[in-house]
């Protein structure tokens, strides 16, 4: 599988798997604000540029999001990503229970917007599911 790094910093790495047309990110440590928004915007642009519709989120190291990031995700990220073509989301859930609550909210929001969401405990299982679609 051909994997290209689109963004890499101390908080997060975003890749694009060209053979399977999958956007993939891995959170390395707590992320919020500008770095989070930049990563989500990079992923959305990858969906748009490549006509991709699958995203693997490895959010095991994610923490709870502040209200302003939750609002930004609702107002900006969700509609933009769906418009860019996002249809399938493999979500590796955060280890922290409080962060899982944020993800459950996002799951419901994206499902309502037409994105099929499956949750996983490891990224390999999520990738396998996306590759099967």
Spans of features found by a protein language model:
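Amphipathic, Lys/Arg-enriched alpha-helical "gate/interface" segment within cytosolic domains
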Residues: 2-133
């Amino acid at each position: 599988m051909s994997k290209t790094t689109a963004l890499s910093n101390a908080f997060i790495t975003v890749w694009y798997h060209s053979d399977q047309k999958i956007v993939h990110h891995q959170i390395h440590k707590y992320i919020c604000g500008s770095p989070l928004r930049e990563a989500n915007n990079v992923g959305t642009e990858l969906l748009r540029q490549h006509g991709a519709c699958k995203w693997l989120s490895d959010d095991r190291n994610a923490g709870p999001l502040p209200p302003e990031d939750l609002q930004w995700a609702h107002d900006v990220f969700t509609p933009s990503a769906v418009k860019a073509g996002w249809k399938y989301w493999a979500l590796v859930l955060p280890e922290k229970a409080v962060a899982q609550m944020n993800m459950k909210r996002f799951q419901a929001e994206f499902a309502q917007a037409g994105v099929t969401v499956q949750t996983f405990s490891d990224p390999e299982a999520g990738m396998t599911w996306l590759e099967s679609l």
